[in-house]
Amino acid sequence: MKSNTKTLTEGPLAKQIFLVSLPLALSNLLQVLFNMSDVAVVGRFAGSTALGAVGSTSILVSLFTGFLIGLSGGINVLVARFYGARHEHDVEKTVHSAAIVSLIAGVVLLFVGLLGSPFMLRLLNTKDDLLPGAILYLRVYFLGMPALALYNFGNAVFSAIGDTKKPLMYLSIAGALNIALNLFFVIVCQLSVMGVALASAISQCASAGLILHALTKVQDCYVLDTKKLHLDPATTKSILGLGIPAGFQNAIFAIANLFIQAGVNSFDSLMVKGNSAAANADAMIYDCMAAFYMACASFMSQNYGAGKPDRVKKSYFISLAYSFGVGLILGGSLFLFGRTFLALFTTESAVIDAGMKRVGVMGFAYCISAFMDCTIAASRGLGKTVVPTIIVVMGSCVFRVIWVYTIFAHFHTIPSLYALYPCSWALTALAEIVYFAHCYKESMRIFEQPKAAA
């Protein structure tokens, strides 16, 4: 194996986690910028109706892309563990099985989006004036789902072995292409909503092509060889065992947010448009924090596989500290400069005022989510995904739905709606931390047994 294994299993952890997480954060931001540029371009050059149409799809986009990201998280953990343990043949089997699993998942979601968009948007009570544009946007956007699944697969593999720079470079290229195509399709071709969706789909294909090509050129056990592509039954079972709960976990948040979006849609179109603009801040801040969650899972999994229990626990606490700090700083900045941020997406002062109602509640709440998400990532790094998913279902999905139909139904104000985020994060975090403490002790016993035998 190459020496880049040392990136995760040797050296000062605080520095190494930061260096691995920084490109991940930038990569995540670029993925968010794909959708943000869609919103910004249509808001500026195609009008507020087009802005509302694109924004009203954000929950559904998050639902399905979240599932793919969760699936790739399972791939990341498995590759990292085998790579840390120097089980080269297992790494090879995981990479080639994961590529096929990812492609299948992307194709399935493609057809779900093409056929189910009208039903899902009506289920969200999407406004009649926004519905045609929203359906068109989703159907064109979902053409890029197989490519997005394959990009996330490649990103998971590179991140698992500590190389987060290549995904960043490829996303930078795709991001620049996305912005250029957005401007061309909307301003020059006057394609409005269809144009920005098409730009996103093309850009996703570009990023997937670049990262897959890079995987075929590496000189290590995680190289992608098209001749070796097959579904190894045992490996596929492990990938799905880790990835499906993680993907479902991500989807659960989006499902719960469907009820929140329905709550937003119960207000006038002005509030819907303001919410669409403000939601971009959520994505930016959350995805910056999420970089440390992926790093946490990778570092814990590799060090667990390498038999270094002392670095396993430290990886969790360092990642938690970083993600909490990022959430606090970025959330506070949004609270102070929210109007300037929202002006990037709309020139209508009434829409900005509406968006600030969300910012006012969420600004200092993001950091709370670090305790929940980083702990979930830590449990995943130890191979535990089922129980954390159950906790998320209860603490986030069920709790939020109950909140919408009780507290929000009673007050019916924007603050009463968005207050459920920090409350559900805190509740779920408490349960996740208790579970992680238990499974950590259980997982560390494997390192104590040889000493007891001596």
Residue ranges, per PLM feature:
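Small-residue-rich hydrophobic transmembrane alpha-helices
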Residues: 51-111, 148-167, 261, 274-338, ...
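Short alpha-helical transmembrane segments in multi-pass integral membrane proteins
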Residues: 1-21, 79-146, 188-244, 300-365, ...
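Hydrophobic transmembrane alpha-helices of multi-pass small-molecule transporters
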Residues: 63, 178-182, 208-212, 284-287, ...
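N-terminal transmembrane alpha-helices
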Residues: 8-45, 59-74, 78, 103-110, ...
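Short runs within selected transmembrane alpha-helices of multi-pass transporters and secretion channels
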Residues: 72, 141-159, 167-175, 196-211, ...
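Small-residue hotspots at the loop-to-helix junctions and early N-terminal turns
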Residues: 46-59, 134, 138, 197, ...
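Transmembrane helical elements of multi-pass membrane transporters/channels
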Residues: 19-38, 140, 151, 174, ...
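Helix-terminus/linker motif at the lipid-water interface of multi-pass membrane proteins
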Residues: 33-51, 121-128, 184-191, 251-284, ...
